[in-house]
Amino acid sequence: MNNSNNLDYFTLYIIFSIAFMLITLLVILIAKPSTGLGEVLVTINLLNALVWLAINLVNRLRERLVNHRDQQ
């Protein structure tokens, strides 16, 4: 099995996670309470969690398909 795709997805997730953490830090440091950036921050963190979930589900399905194919 070629693990380069898994590494690419994991690297992409790490890059997005770091970017979301930096955006979160900037929002916390710069935002004023009345600007509504809190909702943006919550949305960004939710998207980060959904991306993580999607990547993990795709990788698990791919591993199951490869294992099933190898057993035949």
Curated annotation (Swiss-Prot):
GO terms for biological process: cell division. The chain crosses the membrane at residues 10-30, 35-55. Coiled coil: none annotated. It comes from the Bacteria. It is a multi-pass membrane protein. Keywords: Cell cycle, Cell division, Cell inner membrane, Cell membrane, Membrane, Transmembrane, Transmembrane helix. Residues 1-9, 56-72 are cytoplasmic. Interacts with FtsL, FtsQ, FtsI, FtsN, and probably many other cell division proteins. InterPro entries: YmgF. The keyword Cell division applies. The gene is ymgF. It is found in: Cell inner membrane. This is Inner membrane protein YmgF. It comes from Escherichia coli (strain K12). NCBIfam families: YmgF. Could be involved in cell division. May participate in the stabilization of the cell divisome under specific conditions. Residues 31-34 are periplasmic. GO terms for cellular component: division septum; plasma membrane.
